[in-house]
């Protein structure tokens, strides 16, 4: 079954069309000290200095509500934010379950956004496991979305 709506229609429905998706995590630098994530249509500059969950939390607070389309599935967008604006509002234990159950060893994670309108009518939370990414890539944060649940 194919989706009938695209991400532009999703933006209009959520009222976020004026915020745009371009360079959502740009910190104004020229990119030499940041890393580009290539999994979306518009590159996102993630400063290479972000090495902990507090840095990720700050980016989520700063860009809450931005819509980022997925390159390989443009009908879906990641809406930056936490559980508070989703189907999972009030289910803070969901993050704790994911930290304990989804990876071979427990890892602290942060919810970075929600994918709306997935089949089944729920929102799909996306989180990042910074410790796992750092250890796999010799201390560098090379990818933004490390884990979907």
Swiss-Prot record:
Comp. bias (Basic and acidic residues): 1-15
Lineage: Viruses, Duplodnaviria, Heunggongvirae, Peploviricota, Herviviricetes
Family matches, as Pfam families: US22
Name of the gene this protein is made from: MDV097
Native source species: Gallid herpesvirus 2 (strain Chicken/Md5/ATCC VR-987)
Region (Disordered): 1-32
Protein's name according to its UniProt entry: Uncharacterized gene 97 protein
């Amino acid at each position: 079954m194919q989706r009938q709506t695209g991400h532009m229609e999703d933006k209009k429905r959520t009222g976020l069309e004026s915020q745009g998706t371009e360079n959502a995590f740009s910190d104004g630098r020229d990119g030499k000290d940041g890393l580009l994530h290539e999994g979306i249509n518009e590159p996102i500059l993630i400063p290479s200095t972000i090495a902990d969950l507090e840095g990720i939390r700050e980016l989520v607070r700063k860009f809450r509500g931005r819509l980022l389309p997925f390159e390989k599935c443009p009908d879906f967008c990641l809406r930056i934010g936490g559980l508070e604006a989703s189907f999972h509002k009030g289910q803070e234990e969901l993050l704790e379950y994911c930290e304990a159950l989804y990876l071979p060893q427990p890892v602290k994670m942060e919810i970075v956004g929600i994918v709306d309108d997935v089949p089944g009518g729920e929102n799909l939370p996306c989180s990042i496991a910074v410790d796992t990414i750092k250890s796999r890539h010799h201390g560098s944060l090379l990818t933004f979305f490390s884990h979907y649940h």
